Every structure is written in structure tokens, then in C-alpha cells.
Swiss-Prot record:
<comment type="similarity">
    <text>Belongs to the class-IV pyridoxal-phosphate-dependent aminotransferase family.</text>
</comment>
<feature type="modified residue" description="N6-(pyridoxal phosphate)lysine">
    <location>
        <position position="202"/>
    </location>
</feature>
<dbReference type="InterPro" id="IPR043132">
    <property type="entry name" value="BCAT-like_C"/>
</dbReference>
<keyword id="KW-0028">Amino-acid biosynthesis</keyword>
<dbReference type="GO" id="GO:0009097">
    <property type="term" value="P:isoleucine biosynthetic process"/>
</dbReference>
<keyword id="KW-0032">Aminotransferase</keyword>
<comment type="pathway">
    <text>Amino-acid biosynthesis; L-leucine biosynthesis; L-leucine from 3-methyl-2-oxobutanoate: step 4/4.</text>
</comment>
<dbReference type="InterPro" id="IPR033939">
    <property type="entry name" value="BCAT_family"/>
</dbReference>
<dbReference type="Pfam" id="PF01063">
    <property type="entry name" value="Aminotran_4"/>
</dbReference>
<dbReference type="InterPro" id="IPR043131">
    <property type="entry name" value="BCAT-like_N"/>
</dbReference>
<keyword id="KW-0808">Transferase</keyword>
<dbReference type="GO" id="GO:0052655">
    <property type="term" value="F:L-valine-2-oxoglutarate transaminase activity"/>
</dbReference>
<keyword id="KW-0100">Branched-chain amino acid biosynthesis</keyword>
<dbReference type="GO" id="GO:0052656">
    <property type="term" value="F:L-isoleucine-2-oxoglutarate transaminase activity"/>
</dbReference>
<comment type="function">
    <text>Acts on leucine, isoleucine and valine.</text>
</comment>
<dbReference type="InterPro" id="IPR018300">
    <property type="entry name" value="Aminotrans_IV_CS"/>
</dbReference>
<dbReference type="InterPro" id="IPR001544">
    <property type="entry name" value="Aminotrans_IV"/>
</dbReference>
Length: 362
């Protein structure tokens, strides 16, 4: 199968150096976007074609475009980092590309070759390289590849036309004032996904389904919501957009992939990093009752969440119906901080990359 080369059609009017510098001084997250985007089309019978890097601009969609009605949409999230020598590298883009393919299969969409996924990301980062923040802090350039069904029509079936796009947004430090534990509401009424559903696909529908539960968590005074399994309503699965880890002294456990949990790239990486640091890291099942009991008796020493945006987020206060408890006295635990520092050091290029995770742009 042939894949398109990315044709470069750069903007004649990119943002000025001073305008870009003002944004990079306080980028936030997802509020500003670089000068360009990459687009690739897919048409039934023709496959992937017309790969282009073009100026960032709005999309024009017919009101009957199928994605607007039947939600054939998937996305990814990864970061580009400035290295100490001034070069730029992305973190494990092949893992994101493979997960993008898995999401495509689940939603009946065409699979973009992983090499093309990486080529598209590389092309955008290379063109907008000045948008990658300076080395030294936790700032990065966040990449958002996504794909939508663009065929026009109201028939309920897989579309025969799609558009793949990559956009980029400078991202500030997730914890600009230092790492702070988050509070969690354990929802025993709402579920994120069911066996045989789309829980292991990165698709917008899963996030839309989480918004009500997130609002309920906020009403309980919590930052995040934790979901349990859909069958027994007892096994811990994940947060709305992050995986969870439980620390039992030298043993670290993350919920096993069940088909209803998203296979996070950070989650996978931390299993390896933890073992490199001498911890016993494994996948297993943790019930919410066990979580509460082991926290209260002191055997569960720390809990943290992980994902691309924040890397690692310590868990402080946990609430469920009729109960409340704290992890690590509401502070960031020693193991949590050690793992966070170790992974960030690899991503920022301040230590060796023993597993070849960083993809440096030529």
C-alpha cells in the first residue's frame, strides 16, 4: 500500500517572533495553536492521498457530514520536547500510531500506516519548530492527531471518506507552582465503558460520556472522577482521562487491561521505568473496597494517576458515597515523585534513553 508524501505549502503570514514569544511565555494548555497543520485524505478505492502541510485554518463541513451525526472520530495526544542540545524529539510516537490504528479498527475506520502517522507529526514539528518551548522546564509542544469521517450523507454505516489532521499547541507546565495532589470522587453510579464497547479506543464519545460524571465529581468538591467496572461495580478501572497506579511499598500495581480501559502510553512506560528503578511493577485487579481498606490500614502507601498531559499526578483525597480518606497524608509520595522525575528526565533528554523511546527529528 502506497502512502502520500507530505507536500509542504507553508503559510506566507506566520505569527511574528514577538507574537509567538508572548504566547510561549504563558501558553496554558490547548489555548493557542501553531501556524500550520497536516492533512491527509482517505477515499474508498483510492486509499490515502493528498498529504499536505498547510496554514492552520478552520474546516469547512457540510451539515450532513457523517462525523457530525454518527461520531466516527478518533484522536491521539503526544508531545515534542526541546533537548539540551537544542534538537527536538517526540516520545514514543510509534506507540501512539499503533493505538491510532487500534482505535480505527474499533470504529470501522481505515488504518493510517504508523510510518505515515510519524511522518505527519514530524513534518508539522519541523515546520513549526520555533513553537517548541525552550529546554529547562516542563513545557512542550502538544500534538493532536485526529481523524474524522467526511462523507456527506445520513445513512448509518462506515463512511467512505475520511480526513486525518495533525495540529499542535504549545503546552505550559501542568503544575506551574509545583506538583499538587488531586482529589478523586469514586463514581459507583456512572461507568465509563462496558466489555465489548469502546473503552480501549481513544474516541471523543468516551470523553463526552465522562462529562456528566466529571461535573458530579466537581459538585462533590473533587478534581477528578474514578470509574469502576460496569459489571460488578467494584473493580477500579481509570479516571476520565488518566490511568491509575497503586503503590504498596516496593510493589506497584496498575489495573489490568480489560478491553474497557485505555492502554495509556505513559501507563505502559511507567511499568518499565518502575522495574528499572528496582520496583516490582505489575498489572492486576484492585477493588474500591480494597483501596479504602488498604489506605486506612497503611499497606497502600501511595496512589497516582498518569497520562500524557500531566505525566504523573499524585492522588491526595479520595471520596466515595459514605467515606473519605487520604493518600500519603494528602502530599506527593516519595515513589510517585521518583517515578515522575525519572520519566520526565528521559523525555527532556537530561539522562540516557535506555529503551530508545525518544524519536529525534532529523
Amino acid at each position: 500500500m502506497t502512502t502520500p508524501t507530505i507536500e509542504l505549502k507553508p503559510s506566507a503570514h506566520p505569527l511574528s517572533d514577538s507574537e509567538r514569544a508572548a504566547i510561549l511565555a504563558n501558553p496554558g494548555f490547548g489555548r493557542h495553536f501553531t501556524d500550520h497543520m497536516v492533512t491527509i485524505k482517505w477515499t474508498e478505492g483510492r486509499g490515502w492521498h493528498d498529504g499536505q502541510l498547510v496554514p492552520y485554518a478552520p474546516l469547512s463541513l457540510d451539515p450532513a457530514t457523517m462525523v457530525l451525526h454518527y461520531a466516527q472520530e478518533i484522536f491521539e495526544g503526544l508531545k515534542a520536547y526541546r533537548r539540551p542540545d537544542g534538537s527536538v524529539a517526540t516520545f514514543r510516537p510509534e506507540k501512539n500510531g499503533a493505538r491510532f490504528q487500534a482505535s480505527s479498527r474499533r470504529l470501522g475506520m481505515p488504518e493510517l500506516p504508523v510510518d505515515t502517522f510519524i511522518e505527519a507529526c514530524d513534518a508539522l514539528v519541523a515546520q513549526d519548530e520555533k513553537w517548541v518551548p525552550a529546554h529547562g522546564g516542563e513545557e512542550s509542544l502538544y500534538l493532536r492527531p485526529f481523524m474524522i469521517a467526511t462523507e456527506v450523507g445520513l445513512g448509518v454505516r462506515p463512511a467512505n471518506e475520511y480526513l486525518f489532521i495533525v495540529i499542535a499547541s504549545p503546552a505550559g507546565a501542568y503544575f506551574p507552582g509545583g506538583v499538587k495532589p488531586v482529589s478523586i470522587w469514586v463514581s459507583e453510579d456512572r461507568v465509563r465503558a462496558v466489555p465489548g464497547g469502546m473503552g480501549d479506543a481513544k474516541t471523543g464519545g468516551n470523553y463526552a460520556a465522562s462529562l456528566l460524571a466529571q461535573a458530579e465529581a466537581a459538585a462533590k468538591g473533587c478534581d477528578q472522577v474514578c470509574y469502576l467496572d460496569a459489571i460488578e461495580r467494584k473493580w477500579v478501572e481509570e479516571l476520565g482521562g488518566m490511568n491509575l497506579y497503586f503503590v504498596y511499598g516496593n510493589k506497584i500495581v496498575t489495573p489490568s487491561l480489560t478491553g474497557s480501559i485505555l492502554e495509556g502510553v505513559t501507563r505502559d512506560s511507567l511499568l518499565t521505568v518502575a522495574r528499572d528503578l528496582g520496583y516490582e511493577a505489575e498489572e492486576g485487579r484492585v477493588s474500591v473496597d480494597q483501596w479504602q481498606r488498604d489506605s486506612e490500614n497503611g499497606t497502600l502507601t501511595e496512589v497516582f494517576a498518569c497520562g500524557t498531559a500531566a505525566v504523573i499526578t499524585p492522588v491526595g483525597t479520595v471520596k466515595r458515597a459514605g467515606a473519605q480518606w487520604q493518600q500519603s497524608g494528602g502530599e506527593t509520595g516519595e515513589v510517585t515523585q521518583r517515578l515522575r522525575d525519572a520519566l520526565l528526565d528521559i523525555q527532556r533528554g537530561t539522562v540516557a534513553d535506555p529503551h530508545g523511546w525518544m524519536h529525534t527529528l532529523a
